[in-house]
Curated annotation (Swiss-Prot):
Entry keyword annotation includes Disulfide bond: no
Function of the molecule: Essential for recycling GMP and indirectly, cGMP. Required for normal development of the gametophyte and embryo, in association with GK2.
UniProt-recorded name of the protein: Guanylate kinase 1
Active site (catalytic residues): R177, R270, R281
Keyword annotations of the record: ATP-binding, Kinase, Nucleotide-binding, Transferase
BP GO terms, sorted: gametophyte development; nucleotide metabolic process
NCBIfam families, per the entry: guanyl_kin (TIGR03263)
Summary of subunit composition and partner proteins: Monomer.
PROSITE patterns according to UniProt: GUANYLATE_KINASE_2
GO terms, molecular function: ATP binding; guanylate kinase activity
Residue span(s) of domain Guanylate kinase-like: 137-319
Disruption phenotype: No visible phenotype under normal growth conditions, but the double mutant atgk1 and atgk2 is lethal.
Length: 387
């Protein structure tokens, strides 16, 4: 890629970022951001994905350019960008001329998630995270052995609070069965595509079952949250372990039977399985209960000895007793003016409209950010000031 571009860098002490726009062609706007001993070139298109912004890194010590592994679903190319270096190894990127729900993004270059991925992949890594206004209720991970009643508890939640909870739609590489609809029962995916997305860090958890992949994508969980609902994930202990290791901030609940004898009685009462199948389920359940209680994955343990009482305890743990549903998530993004200048003052980004007869401002407060790559970054507060 050649030598590093000569750029002018605004000084942070003047209240401005060190992000500067550089144009090689009218429709190929790029921006450079100086972070320590590296320069990040953001813009153009990704070398393997023409629908995502490209990222290149220039190392000042070795005087070399290189392409990092880019994790997460990245933003589409735009007509221009403004960028600011934030704490926790993040770069705030504001896209010019973009739809209101696609204007704010974060490129993580040295966050805890990125550092962990660097260790795992043994390569240079960056990760994209979409910025979202407001906050949302934490997703709920519910695990427990087969026959413990967790499915019934979830159904009771969904029936009593239909507008509050939602399920993420899982991905699978198996073929659709009769009456199954893509995007409703599963997202039916090509195996090579799903394998690549798993490698790119786009899945919270996955497993191979009889030669087919099954998994929960980060985007499917975020889509439920974006709709204003609280996502419920009904997954096994291994899946919960993967979610716990991710950046998703969730509540982890494990449901236990009152005893193995009670669990065996429930399985036999179904009348749908052979003796061999029942014994296999009991062996698996015993191992799963042991791991669920002692692994440290689950912060909350429920014993389902009485369904109604267990459900009351579940609602109490989730803060649902006598409370109306209030969700602070807002996904509409920000309406940016056509022409504007951007500056930074402490934890606030000031977007100043630059028309002839206007002094309107948009103040973006980033003091309460939470979440992050490879999911959404939430907690953005916006205040419009009109003159």
């Amino acid at each position: 890629m050649g030598e590093a571009p000569a750029v002018l860098v605004d000084h942070p002490e003047n209240g401005h970022s060190n992000g500067v726009c550089v144009k090689s062609e009218p429709e190929n706007t790029e921006i450079t951001v100086d972070v320590g001993d590296r320069i990040f070139l953001i813009g153009g298109t990704h070398e393997r994905n023409n629908f995502s912004i490209g990222v290149q890194i220039y190392d000042k010590i070795s005087n070399n350019w290189f392409s990092p592994i880019v994790l997460g679903t990245g933003p589409k190319p735009s007509k221009g960008y403004s960028a600011f270096v934030l704490e926790q190894g993040r770069i705030l990127v504001i896209k010019k001329g973009s739809p209101r729900n696609d204007s704010i993004w974060f490129l993580e270059v040295d966050s805890p998630y990125v550092r962990e991925q660097k260790k795992l992949l043994r390569k240079e890594v960056v990760a994209w995270s979409k910025g979202v206004r407001g906050n949302a209720e934490k997703p709920i991970v519910i695990s427990g052995p087969s026959g413990v009643g967790k499915g019934t508890l979830i159904s009771m939640l969904m029936k009593e609070f239909p507008s509050m909870f939602g399920f993420s739609v899982s991905h699978t590489t198996r073929s659709p069965r009769s009456m199954e609809m893509d995007g409703v029962h599963y997202h039916f995916a090509d195996k090579k595509v799903m394998e690549k997305e798993i490698k790119d860090g786009k899945f919270l958890e996955f497993a191979s079952v009889h030669g087919n992949l099954y998994g929960t994508s980060i985007e499917s969980v975020e889509a439920v949250t974006d709709s204003g609902k609280r996502c419920i994930l009904d997954i096994d202990v291994q899946g919960a372990r993967s979610v716990r290791a991710s950046s998703l901030d969730a509540i982890f609940i494990f449901v236990c039977p009152p005893s193995m004898k009670e669990l065996e009685d429930r399985l036999r009462a179904r009348g749908t399985e052979t003796e061999e199948q029942i014994q296999k389920r009991l062996r698996n359940a015993e191992a799963e209960i042991k791991e669920g209680i002692s692994s440290g994955i689950f912060g909350l343990i429920l014993y389902n000895d009485n369904l109604e009482e267990c459900y009351k305890k579940l609602k109490n743990l989730l803060g649902l007793d006598g409370l109306a549903h209030v969700n602070g998530v807002e996904i509409e993004g920000i309406n940016l003016p056509i022409e504007y200048a951007v500056s930074k003052m402490e934890d606030k980004i000031i977007i100043q409209e630059t028309g002839k007869e206007t002094r309107n401002k948009i103040v973006v407060d980033i003091s309460s950010l939470n979440g992050g790559a490879p999911g959404r970054t939430r907690g953005i507060l916006v205040d419009a000031i009109k003159f």
